Amino acid sequence: MAEFTPITIAYGDGIGPEIMEAVLYILRKAEARIRLETIEVGEKLYVKHYSSGISEQSWESIERTGVILKAPITTPQGGGYKSLNVTIRKTLQLFANIRPSVSFYPFTKTLHPNLNLTIIRENEEDLYAGIEYRQTHNMYESVKLISRTGCEKIIRYAFEYAVKNNRKKVTCLSKDNIMKFSDGIFHKVFNEIAKEYPQINNEHYIIDIGTARLATKPEIFDVIVTSNLYGDIISDVAAEISGSVGLAGSANIGEHYAMFEAVHGSAPDIAGQDIANPSGLLNAAIMMLVHIGQGDIATLIENAWKKTIEDGMHTADIYNKDHSTKKVGTKEFAEEVVKRLGQKPEKLAKADYPLVTKKQESNTTYKINTKEVKKLVGTDIFVGMNVASAHDIADKVNKLDIGNFELKTISSKGLKLWPRDTRFETISDHWCCRFMAKDGVELKHLDITKLLETLSKANIDFIKVENLFEFDGAAGYSLAQGE
């Protein structure tokens, strides 16, 4: 008797329920060996005051099955709500987001008939973590966190993916010409790990020119690895130029759990009209079937889907008079795929997945390097003061006894404004005061707390503290522009 794999299903919001019904219909007709557990997430939970969009009962189902197929959800805009996608990815430690983009030319309209690439996006870190603060009346902050171990995991995964899938090149995208620490470590780790895979070509682009090349010459790319926010943006670019965002599915992979979803959003403006393309979620389901070792069913469905595309049965988003035979709705598209189960495409590449898929694993143990000598050399204290000039703050601070520190610079938004030859006025209530240790002084954390107490007594409103360290003598902090 065939073994059935338990799968958690989330219908989502907007067009989610109708495309999920279409996909489940195809899975049933293809006799996928799965047992479904349905959970409620997204908008219905948000209105019940679940700020994360998911309940404890839903978590229990995901933890029980280990695999979730999720339709798009709607995250309410504005404060008070957290993205469910980000919450699931981070909670389940789904560190790798895999997003293939393939052209189905001439059956779908595209300027790039040879497009065939995969974007591997880091899934847990970066600005996408959503760590944000309002610090003053005027200033808002979003924190970008990148770890060496996070870089190592995703970059090694990308090279292993290239090896496993007979890819020839891995391209890294970053902005390390500006963000020399966060994006800098991503690029540095890429260069280190690339040396371990001499059979795979490697290259690096700055994200802006890399995105431009992706939009105009996508055929030059094979596998792209990048950080979270960049990956989110460029994967939509790749999906769009392939013919339709509605065709792209994605996998979110961790050590113990996996989530599969369409790349596109919930599109509430077309919900309930039976016009949405279910292909993105269907392709995600195909990736899920491969992941759980049902490559035979994945092959059956993908070949039927490609034959449907070849035969011109197209939803509105990809319909064109040159290669489309009939404009079909969501339900009819699913029915057309089912009619072609057992058939194979004639021009598009035929799918042929192995029955049992070996999980992509790494024997590497990721550890934090603590061998570098870490030395406290100063502190950046951010203050909230509505003054016309940094000189006003400097005049006030320099009248105080600041112990083992000396005030080196005052900056705003990364631009040094003191000391300068002239009093430069700027509109700001958010200032960074850089205090460095006096010559010959070995700083302790107690020195910083004393400094904060001194500032507080002087009615200087400190709003944030960033301590400055050297690691093996190298500065672990950036300089302000002009410093």
From Swiss-Prot:
It catalyses: D-threo-isocitrate + NADP(+) = 2-oxoglutarate + CO2 + NADPH. D-threo-isocitrate binds at residues 83, 85, 89, 99, 121. The record marks 128, 175 as: Critical for catalysis. PROSITE patterns: IDH_IMDH (PS00470). Keywords: Glyoxylate bypass, Magnesium, Manganese, Metal-binding, NADP, Oxidoreductase, Tricarboxylic acid cycle. NADP(+) binds at residues 74, 264-270, 277. Binds 1 Mg(2+) or Mn(2+) ion per subunit. Its cofactor is Mg(2+); Mn(2+). SMART domains: Iso_dh. It is an enzyme of class 1 (oxidoreductase). Pfam families: Iso_dh, Isocitrate_DH_C_bact. The keyword Manganese applies. InterPro entries: IsoCit/isopropylmalate_DH_CS, Isocitrate_DH_bac-typ, Isocitrate_DH_TT1725_C, Isocitrate_DH_TT1725_C_sf, IsoPropMal-DH-like_dom. GO terms for biological process: glyoxylate cycle; isocitrate metabolic process; tricarboxylic acid cycle. SUPFAM superfamilies: Isocitrate/Isopropylmalate dehydrogenase-like (SSF53659). The keyword Repeat does not apply. Homodimer. Catalyzes the oxidative decarboxylation of isocitrate to 2-oxoglutarate and carbon dioxide with the concomitant reduction of NADP(+). Belongs to the isocitrate and isopropylmalate dehydrogenases family. This is Isocitrate dehydrogenase [NADP].
